[in-house]
Amino acid sequence: MAQTLYDKLWQSHVVETGDDGTTVLYIDRHLLHEVTSPQAFEGLKLAGRRPWRVSANLMVADHNVPTTDRANGIADPTSRLQVETLDGNAHEYGLTYFSMRDKRQGIVHVIGPEQGATLPGMTVVCGDSHTSTHGAFGCLAHGIGTSEVEHVLATQTLLAQKSKAMLVQVDGALPDGVTAKDIVLAVIGKIGTAGGTGYAIEFAGSTIRSLSMEGRMTICNMAIEAGARAGMVAVDDITINYVKGRPLSPVGPHWDRAVEYWRTLHSDAGAKFDLVVTLNAAEIKPQVSWGTSPEMVVAVDGRVPDPDKEKDPTKRDGMEKALIYMALKPNTPITDIRIDKVFIGSCTNSRIEDLRAAAAVVRGKYRASNVKLAMVVPGSGLVKEQAEREGLDKIFKAAGFEWREPGCSMCLAMNADRLEPGERCASTSNRNFEGRQGAGGRTHLVSPAMAAAAGIEGHFVDVRALKH
């Protein structure tokens, strides 16, 4: 019987399935950070247990770490305690850990693939909703809660219910200036933030196959924003070439056997999906979110929607509330929206490809006078090193953009990087909820190139026109 990629990944990790469908799944890789792990380790201690499989765990501090000079440590006492607790747990249990001063440190969903800790065919979990990122490698990857973090530490398994399967098929050549971020925002704009609820999404089609691994990670990263449990992309040569030679990748005959298996990680011809959604890449334009949900998004040449034209009363009410919070009026051209800050970073868009795209836009230009701050936060110390070897840091600095240390930063404002009330930000992150980047802050989700262009012009602009 023809199987989907999701079927294959699920079935290969089933330990036991109960009469009600509840399944014990084996977990290959467990990623941990400082925010959702302290209570899990405390539970482990109280029960007198130790991690079942030490080598399956990889820990890093990312949410609370400062992106400015780290010589003086972390100023905020709560943030400092979380990171110190992570340090202590890593040492007590002998788990692999990239501390704040380790050059391999970075955002957990950047360092996993970078180190080869994420490999095709794995089940990958983390106490973080954007764990779906790792599905780009043909993995079954999703976020878990703190109690589940403890369960995985103790048993290397997870209780789960199988989701339905959705196929998002994107075909055609991607227009100039349109990126993976624009694809996934367009998908969410089409199906809504609840469109993927109850599903695991496979992203496929000629457009997806043409993307780099960085682009595929961007798309899978935001599968959760469509409501999906997981997002994934089939394995191909691009996948295999990316993981080859990574520190934790197999070598020698183990590599050969792994590749043979990895090449089976695709949906079979004739495999049945519960829902199929199609997009024509040629019709996708650079996207800009205007509201307080990722589904509130339009093309850069569009206008802020008018709630009066929305027939669904619930959606209309949400739109009206979003416009009030965002201080926008219906029918305002997107290109008339002025910004105060720019944030280029996050687990969505902080990899080397993202930084190159942003640098290409700002090269030889300078930040607009009304933009108070434009910051670039690499996804890891290794991404930062590579960018500096390529001279990208100098391009950003010359354009008036700040070059920072790696971390989650302004994506969720748990460290000192945040918006002040009323400030408006062009952000390459994944969530534009109320207060996400700071109390009263207003977030617009865009691609790295679009964020860079807004920083130069002081308002949203079609990056395709700016390039020319």
From Swiss-Prot:
Cofactor dependency: [4Fe-4S] cluster
Keyword field: 4Fe-4S, Amino-acid biosynthesis, Branched-chain amino acid biosynthesis, Iron, Iron-sulfur, Leucine biosynthesis, Lyase, Metal-binding
Pathway membership, UniProt: Amino-acid biosynthesis; L-leucine biosynthesis; L-leucine from 3-methyl-2-oxobutanoate: step 2/4
UniProt family annotation: Belongs to the aconitase/IPM isomerase family. LeuC type 1 subfamily.
Keyword Iron-sulfur included in the entry's annotation: yes
One of the GO BP terms on file: L-leucine biosynthetic process
Enzyme Commission code(s) on record: 4.2.1.33
Family matches, as PROSITE patterns: ACONITASE_1 (PS00450), ACONITASE_2 (PS01244)
InterPro entries linked: 3-IsopropMal_deHydase_lsu, Acnase/IPM_dHydase_lsu_aba_1/3, Acoase/IPM_deHydtase_lsu_aba, Aconitase_4Fe-4S_BS, Aconitase_4Fe-4S_dom, IPM_dehydratase_rel_enz, IPMI_cat
GO-annotated molecular function: 3-isopropylmalate dehydratase activity; 4 iron, 4 sulfur cluster binding; metal ion binding
Protein's recorded name: 3-isopropylmalate dehydratase large subunit
Cofactor-binding details, from the entry: Binds 1 [4Fe-4S] cluster per subunit.
Complex and partners: Heterodimer of LeuC and LeuD.
Stated role: Catalyzes the isomerization between 2-isopropylmalate and 3-isopropylmalate, via the formation of 2-isopropylmaleate.
Gene this protein is translated from: leuC
Reaction(s) catalysed (UniProt annotation): (2R,3S)-3-isopropylmalate = (2S)-2-isopropylmalate
Source organism superkingdom: Bacteria
Binding site for [4Fe-4S] cluster: C347, C408, C411
Stretches of the chain forming a coiled coil according to its record: none
